[in-house]
Amino acid sequence: MARVDWTKLDLKERVVSINRVSKVVKGGKNFRFSVTVVVGDAERGYVGVGRGKAAEIPDAIRKAIEDAKKHLIKVPIVGTTIPHEVIGEFGAGKVLLKPAREGTGVIAGGPVRAVLESAGIKDVLTKSLGSSNATNMVYATIEGLKRLRTAEDVAKLRGIPVSQLFE
């Protein structure tokens, strides 16, 4: 997949999780921070997730934002929702994403909500299955969004007109 030029996008950042990790060494414990960040342009339907690790939180956040900008994806949005139901998996985390009627809102837990709102999806139903680890849930959501296809995409792949898809 081609890299997205993030300089032309109006990206908003959201810190999803800050995790203190330690390494036990001869002289005691070395503490560092692992941060997961979601960036997105809700107007254009772009979203990305990144992780950063550093001795200080601000450095870890900066690294995570840089990483997220390198991993942007375009999300297919139909009206205010997603084109079809999908399950995203990452590690032990599974996230079910279902399209919803207009006016439903984003029915999702914290980490999943951050990704969907950053992508510009306004109406969707979700269910977290498996791991409740914030980082795994965020990456599972991204995997689900990567699997989405519009009717036009499916018709093009099959080499048939869109009208023939629904017969």
UniProtKB/Swiss-Prot annotation:
GO cellular component assignments: small ribosomal subunit
Keywords: Ribonucleoprotein, Ribosomal protein, RNA-binding, rRNA-binding
Pfam families: Ribosomal_S5, Ribosomal_S5_C
Superkingdom of the source species: Bacteria
Ribosomal protein in keyword set: yes
GO biological process, one term: translation
Transmembrane segments: none
GO molecular function, one term: rRNA binding
Domain (S5 DRBM) ranges: 11-75
Keyword match rRNA-binding: yes
Subunit record text: Part of the 30S ribosomal subunit. Contacts proteins S4 and S8.
Family of the protein in this entry: Belongs to the universal ribosomal protein uS5 family.
UniProt free text on domains: The N-terminal domain interacts with the head of the 30S subunit; the C-terminal domain interacts with the body and contacts protein S4. The interaction surface between S4 and S5 is involved in control of translational fidelity.
Function, as annotated: With S4 and S12 plays an important role in translational accuracy.
Listed NCBIfam families: rpsE_bact
Protein's recorded name: Small ribosomal subunit protein uS5
Species of origin: Thermoanaerobacter pseudethanolicus (strain ATCC 33223 / 39E)
